[in-house]
């Protein structure tokens, strides 16, 4: 599925705030007439978008996949779209069976009313070559305590980053990152830290010291949510 996260508090259901998960669940239940537990591959944060989110729900009822998808898209708001639906194995779990999650972050280097909603307008230059060199410090299995919120409920802060790279193309700078899992606010904090290191002419040791500190206050300021997309989930 795809969604524009601008008007939502994120994927996960919360009280007194619109969530992607709740919005889709409500529409499924209208069509199906039964209660469902919609499980997403991951919890995108408030304001974060998705190009390839995956979710599943279980039912004992017979469903015509084509008609169900068409009906669901017809009543979903315009900022949420179901791209594909298929029957999965009974034991499939979109969250726990996901091997890797991939995110992209978009920077625009010129002001455009058409890019503002889905990219971070950043007027200063970004040296992708130097940023890619700094990215090497994030690769592998590490403790990302310094790159997530202090009051997060997640006890295990170990994540394995397989790939992280920057690329410039047609007025946009794209950051791509792939890992087995991500913590709350982790991607945006990593990006903010990389930019901080670039602006202050820091080397890899700067990044290593942040990891060692295991304290969010040592990392850079998180970049805005509007440029971040859940790009793909790999199974």
Put a short name on every predicted segment.
Residues 1-235:
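Structured-RNA-binding interfaces characteristic of tRNA pseudouridine synthases
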């Amino acid at each position: 599925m795809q969604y524009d996260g601008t008007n939502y508090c994120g994927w996960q259901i919360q009280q007194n705030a619109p969530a992607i998960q709740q919005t889709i669940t409500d529409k499924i239940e209208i069509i199906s007439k039964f209660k469902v537990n919609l499980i997403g591959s991951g919890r995108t944060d408030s304001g974060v978008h998705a190009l390839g989110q995956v979710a599943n729900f279980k039912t004992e009822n017979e469903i015509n996949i084509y008609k169900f998808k068409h009906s669901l898209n017809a009543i979903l708001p315009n900022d949420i779209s179901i791209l594909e639906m298929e029957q999965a194995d009974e034991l499939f779990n979109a969250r726990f069976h996901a091997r890797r999650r991939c995110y992209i972050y978009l920077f625009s280097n010129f002001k455009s009313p058409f890019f503002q909603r889905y990219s971070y307008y950043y007027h200063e230059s970004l040296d992708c070559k130097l940023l890619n060199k700094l990215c090497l410090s994030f690769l592998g299995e590490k403790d990302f305590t310094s790159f997530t919120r202090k009051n997060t409920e997640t006890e295990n802060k170990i994540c394995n980053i397989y790939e992280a790279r920057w690329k410039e193309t047609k007025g946009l700078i794209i950051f791509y990152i792939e890992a087995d899992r991500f913590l709350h606010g982790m991607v945006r904090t990593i990006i903010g830290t990389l930019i901080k290191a670039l602006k202050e002419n820091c080397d890899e040791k700067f990044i290593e010291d942040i990891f060692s500190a295991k304290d969010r206050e040592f990392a850079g300021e998180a970049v805005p949510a509007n440029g971040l997309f859940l790009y793909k989930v790999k199974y």
